[in-house]
Amino acid sequence: MYPLGRVSLPVRSPVCLFCQNRTSSLLPSAYVWQSARTMASGRLRRKAARMALSPNVAKTSLKKKRNDTDRFGPFAGMNQTEARIRDDPRSRSPASLKRSKAPSDESGRKDSELYKALKMQTALAPIPYGRRSAIKAKIAEITSFDQFPLLPVVRHSIFSQALPGLHDVTPTPIQRVAIPRLLDDTNKDKKPKKRAEGEPEYDQYLLAAETGSGKTLAYLIPLVNTVKQQEAIEKEEQKREEEEKAKEREEKLKNQAFDVEPELPPLSNAGRPRVIILVPTAELVAQVGAKVKTLSHTIKYRSGMISSNLTPRRIKNTLFNPDGIDILVTTPHLLASIAKTEPYVLSRVSHLVLDEADSLLDRSFQPITTEIIEKTSGSLQKLILCSATIPRSLDNFLRKKYPDIQRLTTPNLHAIPRRVQLGVVDIQKDPYRGNRNLACADVIWSIGKAGDSEPAGPFASYQGPSVKKILVFVNEREEADEVAQFLRSKGIDAHSLSRDSSARRQEEILAEFTEAGAPPSSEEIMLAQKKGRQDDAIPFEAPSKPHEPHKLPNTKVLVTTDIASRGIDTLAVKTVILYHVPHTTIDFIHRLGRLGRMNKRGRGIVLVGKKDRKDVVKEVREGMFRGQALI
């Protein structure tokens, strides 16, 4: 036992024990509240302009009405980019302005606010529905391609080459709006407009329509018609020039027989196209180039397509053909690199098309694309921009660079077709329990084992079972190979497609999902009938063919990124699975836009997890059901 003098007594705290416990319990709740407020402010943060669609696509000019709160007060002159100096320095007071205001018209009120979730992510922007109704009434008058002032050979090629096998061929809404304007039949009698100094001397057009609406033919038909007309005019001028040169040559021979100067050879048209169509990817070069080549079989013009997937020798032979070239389909980077060494490539261009303009005028392509436009401005007559989505960044660029651009839009712009159904699968529920790969495989197995929803055609009895083709979109290209490998382990015929895939593999895979099956030939029908008679003549039951266990038959799946979401004409695809919820409504439109093409039905399925924005998916689904634009 220690002596009494050595024992140290504990010092009592001035704060009681209950107060200490209460203070420590309040600290975590404050931290949670601060983190929750940080997350909420992060959700409300506005996204970049390139990821948000413009609300004023169809409006030619913007006149914003300034609020009184912006004009008066201590902070009225802050954050201004323009001077806005009034001619009359005296301004009226708010009271006098309020007294002089006209009575408000309730019928002229603005529409209700945008969907809350879509507005939070700054998604697709609206066109006024009054404008949409006016466009509908205008295009209802056009019901046939015969109403367009086209050359007979061009009109015949639309039915025989561009849209073969269709009995009732009618122009789509964007074709009814764009073809007459691009043919200049509405502006024939108008005097040429005087342009201010610094403004481009060529005409500018913006074609904005929903996915799968025939935008390629909307600009290609007028271009081909113009090429043939220019060809006829040039032949007459060439004939006239040859006659004049022959007369001059005879006069020179008579006057100065020994002082005849040698004539310069005429400038060759090799490597000098009339029309250039720019697209962002090599896959779109192959698709658009094939459509251009198909029309040339009957209309007889020279076309070519070049991309980085081709060899240098083939690019040189295509572009610098001695016979010349009329229409060229390529990418901006390849064309810009060729123009540095061969500047005459852009010296004869009269029409320039930017297909998928929202990509070509994005941050990655904009410097090169604008450089090409400036180099062709000397001979350029028309600049045509074409896109299914108009982001705010593109709209702002066009209003500054081309304020007089003619905006040709359709009523269903920024809307997913109503013939496309959207389903939602919650992967948090049983039996998936958060396993996204398992949910994707189960959905594909359910679709593969189900019957075909479309009615059988007249050749169904002579054809084998139809192969179902499904697209699976992921947000990251690293996950494309992983998801495809997992699906193959579950007995599904799956392939992956991303920017890392080789060019040849990309062409082979896309060919299976873009080419619709042709009807069987007469020989195939005869062989199928003969085989059917032989099977019926056997008196006993034939042994069934052994099937591999756990293999899903007659189903092909392509796991891809946004490389296949823009412009690819996937007519053979009837189902799209969104493995992840898209980041923006722009991606929603382009991914689900692989369905519902050429008035066909389609089905989209979204896999929604714990951290996904279910409110966005819900409002997109409601907007699709109502047929409204995703604004």
UniProtKB/Swiss-Prot annotation:
Q: Which domain of life is it from?
A: Eukaryota
Give the motif span (Q motif).
143-176
Instruction: Answer whether the UniProt record assigns the keyword Plastid to this protein.
Output: no
Region annotation Disordered: where it falls in the sequence: 55-111, 181-200
Do the record's keywords include ATP-binding?
Answer: yes
Domain comment, in the record's words? The Q motif is unique to and characteristic of the DEAD box family of RNA helicases and controls ATP binding and hydrolysis.
Protein name, UniProt field: ATP-dependent RNA helicase mrh4, mitochondrial
Q: Name one GO molecular function term.
A: ATP hydrolysis activity
Recite the UniProt keywords alphabetically. ATP-binding, Helicase, Hydrolase, Mitochondrion, Nucleotide-binding, RNA-binding, Transit peptide
Biological source species: Aspergillus terreus (strain NIH 2624 / FGSC A1156)
EC code(s) of this entry: 3.6.4.13
